[in-house]
Structure formats: C-alpha cells, structure tokens
Curated annotation (Swiss-Prot):
The family this protein is said to belong to: Belongs to the class I-like SAM-binding methyltransferase superfamily. RNA M5U methyltransferase family.
EC number: 2.1.1.-
Alphabetized InterPro entries for the sequence: MeTrfase_TrmA_AS, MeTrfase_TrmA_CS, NA-bd_OB-fold, SAM-dependent_MTases_sf, TRAM_dom, U5_MeTrfase_fam
Protein name (Swiss-Prot/TrEMBL): Uncharacterized RNA methyltransferase spyM18_1360
Organism of provenance: Streptococcus pyogenes serotype M18 (strain MGAS8232)
High-level lineage: Bacteria, Bacillati, Bacillota, Bacilli, Lactobacillales
GO biological process: rRNA base methylation
Keyword set includes Transmembrane helix: no
Length: 462
C-alpha cells in the first residue's frame, strides 16, 4: 500500500498492534476518534486532546476500533472519578467527561447533524438544558440476572457481549432502586433461586425490573421468570414488602423464549396493584410494567415545557399528538388548548392514555389506537384542523408517509421531539422541502452521563 503523501510506504496495521495516536474528536456515540495513516479509529474512554498508546482491536477497509493501553496526556475535560465499570457496560458511556463538557458535546451533535444531513447552519442551536444533579436520576431499572463465580448476580452486560459484570451501585439509577435490587438479589440467593443460563436455556430468573415514582415514591418490582411457578414466592413477597413498604406492586412476567426481549407476553400481579402512580407537570399517571414513561422525570418535565413553549398555544388551538403513548405529552398540552387528538398503534398504551385523562379529569383529550397516517386522514374528513402537530417518534424517526399525511393536515406549526439528531435532521430536511421552515432548536439532557440527547425543534409553515 502506497500513501498519496510523497509515496511513503505504510505498514498495514493488524489486530493487537500498539500505536501512539492523538484523539481529535468524539463520535456521536461518545468514542474517541483518532486518525492514523488514512485510518479512522474509534476508542472507548478517550477524549479530544488526549495522546494515548492504542491497541488495535479490529481493522476494516478505512476504519477500525482500538482500546487504550496507556495515556501520555490527559484532557482537562476528563472526569477522573468515574468507575470504569460504567464505561465498560455502557451505563454511563460519557461518565469520563465533565458534565459541562457533556452538555457542549450534545449541542454539537445536534449542530453537526443539522449541517451534515439537512444543510442547515443559519438556525441557532441553543445550549443544552442540563440537570442540576446529573446522577441517580433514572426512575426505572431493567437488570439481568445470571450466575457469576457460582452465585446469583445482578448487574449489566459488558458492551457488545452477554458477559454480566456484577454491580451494586448503578450510578445513574435512583438510589432507592439500587437498594431494592440489591436486597432482592441477596434474598433470592438465600432462597436458592436459580438464575437464567442463556447458553443452556436453563434456570428460573431472567431479569429484575424496578420502577419508582419520582414524586410519589411508589415502587414496583417485576420478576421475569422462565416458567410460571416460583419457589417460595409468598416468602419472597413478604420479605420485600417488609423491608420496602413503598413497594405497592409485585408482578411476575413469564418469558420462556430464546430472545433478548426483556418481557414475555404474560403478566401476573402477585402483590398489590397492577400499576404505580406518579405525576408530571401536575398530572397523575398510572404506570404499568410495560408503560413507556420517561426515565428521567425532572428533565422530561423540562422537555415537555419546552415543547409547550415552542408551540405557543391558546385556548382556540387544536393539537394532534402523534406517538401519544400513555398520554404524558398530550395531557400536558390539554390544559392550554381547545382539544388534543392523540394516536398510538399500541392498544394497551391507548387504554392507559384514556385512563390517565379520566384520572386527571381531562375531558378535551381524545386517544385512538391506529396508525397516525390513517387517523389523520379520518380526522381531516371530520373537519378537524390542527394548529399544531406534535411528534415524538422512536429513534428511526418519521416515515415518508407520515410526513406527507402531517403536511396534508396543514398545521401552522410542527413541534418535533427527537431522541436521535440524525433522523431528526433527515426529517427536518424533508419538511423544509414541503414548505416548513426550521425556527427553533433546543437540546435537552434527559440522559446525563450517556451520549444520548433529546431535542425539541419548531417548524413553521411558510
């Protein structure tokens, strides 16, 4: 191989080679980026400005992956206090970066996506709204259970593997959730409950899922098992409730499939209620084991407040809430508008949204189980003319058919809540081609210590 640079011959790199590199940037997933002889390498736990010895792990045609063998220079933006376990599992893959710099990184992710994908550079991306206390914020935990060194353990999988790393302090989870997981782990050891073996397809307990209401403090425990019968389940329940009076719901889920999915289809309430209750922006919500409910309540409120402010609503406005889930965004809007029409493909979520509307005495919010495209076409025939269409899609973003259907409704504004800057930028580009202009962009940090960023954008009809 001959380099275009003055014909210099370059030795082809291979696995386990060790080279010295300088880190120039962070990838969108928070990995350090190093360039060496025409190759781009991605390195975990490496920050811009750092100089490292890197072991080559994998080499592709023009890129590769490496790991740090030694540091020659450390970035002043490095958080030296983070436990490397959190980086190895991906629990906190940006935990080695100071929080102020995490917020800057997330703003840059949004800016870069808008410029590279949508060609937009003339709209101000505001500074990321951060969290005052950016640790111990998650109100939900999904923890795998496996046998490690001969005993039942809870923790997280090493990145890109199914090797469990035992963990007691999960860093970004509510500390009371951590306590409950650790107590349940120790209790199940005493009762000799067999952990799931993924390779042999044996054992009983696959996962422990815990939810906690941020404001209510109510807690739910879900034991995911491979079969219905659980040995000494009454004694397990008694001990958990005795130690944690805030536990108001204990549920068993049966998952006997060879799958990476957390839950199977069958749920059975073993103790207490089917749901816990919590509040957001003054509304109460019944939250089931399966409900999609933002894991960071404090920052979700700021996210929704931003969406409401961008939409600039009045009592004469009609809002369509696409991807309405259990109604958290739509019901937050309902107080300030004439009506909210929500659509969601998951029927159980629609039932939850309807129940949550009733729970809060909200009578101007209507939820249907349907595709958004079909529901909007039906509403248009019924003469419903929205001022604002609110979208909060999954990471894959919007489909072309959805974009076309939403534009056909003719809203003056589209408020887009995104969890993926790349697909958001792609969708904004398409909306601009169809007559909408990007007006406002606000990143919000729902997931401190990780590379993930949420964003609210406002599109206005030209």
């Amino acid at each position: 191989m001959v380099s275009p640079r003055k014909g210099k011959r370059i030795r082809m790199l291979k696995k386990n080679d060790i080279i010295q590199v300088a880190i120039s940037d962070l990838s969108h997933e928070g990995a350090g980026v190093a360039k060496h002889d025409g190759f781009v390498f991605f390195v975990d736990n490496a920050l811009p400005e750092e100089v490292i010895d890197m072991r080559v792990l994998k080499v592709n045609k023009n890129s590769g992956f490496g790991k740090v063998e030694a540091y020659h220079y450390l970035s002043p933006a490095r958080n030296a206090d983070v436990n490397l376990t959190y980086l190895r599992t991906g629990i906190a893959d940006l935990g080695h970066l100071t929080y102020e710099d995490q917020l800057t990184f997330k703003k840059k992710q949004v800016q870069d996506s808008l410029y590279k994908i949508a060609g937009i550079s003339d709209v101000t991306v505001e500074s990321t709204i951060g969290m005052t206390e950016p640790l111990a914020y998650r109100n939900k935990a999904q923890v795998p259970v496996r046998r490690v060194n001969g005993q039942l353990e809870t923790g997280f999988f090493r990145k890109h593997s199914h090797d469990l790393i035992p963990i007691s302090d999960y860093y970004i989870q509510d500390k009371e959730i951590d306590r409950l997981i650790n107590f349940t782990r120790d209790l199940l050891r005493r009762f000799d409950i067999k952990p799931y073996d993924e390779t042999e397809q044996t054992g009983l307990l696959r996962n422990i899922v815990v939810r906690r209401g941020h404001y209510s403090g109510e807690m739910m425990v879900v034991l995911v098992t491979t079969r219905p019968k659980v040995f000494r389940v009454d004694q397990v329940i008694e001990k958990i409730v005795e130690a944690f009076p805030a536990v108001v719901s204990i549920i068993q889920n049966i998952n006997d499939e060879n799958t990476n999915a957390i839950f199977g289809k069958d749920f059975k309430t073993l103790y207490g209620k089917d749901t816990i209750t919590d509040s957001m922006l003054g509304n109460n919500y019944a939250i089931s084991a399966q409900s999609f409910y933002q894991v960071n309540t404090v920052m979700a409120e700021k996210l929704y407040q931003t969406a409401i402010a961008f939409s600039d609503l009045s009592k004469d406005d009609i809002v369509i809430d696409a991807y309405s889930g259990i109604g958290t965004i739509g019901l937050s809007f309902a107080k300030t508008v004439k009506a909210v029409y929500g659509v969601e493909v998951i029927e159980a979520a629609v039932r939850d949204a309807q129940q949550n509307a009733a729970l809060n005495g909200i009578t101007n919010a209507y939820f249907v189980a349907d595709t958004a495209e079909h529901a909007m076409a039906t509403w248009a025939k019924d003469g419903i003319k929205p001022s604002v269409i609110l979208v909060d899609p999954p990471r894959k973003g919007l489909t072309e058919s959805f974009i076309q259907a939403s534009v056909a409704m003719g809203p003056q504004k589209i408020t887009y809540v995104s969890c993926n800057p790349a697909t958001m930028a792609r969708d904004i580009k398409r909306y601009q081609e169809l007559g909408y202009k990007l007006a406002k962009v606000q990143p919000v940090d729902l997931f401190p210590q990780t590379h993930h960023v949420e964003c609210v954008v406002l599109l206005i009809k030209e």
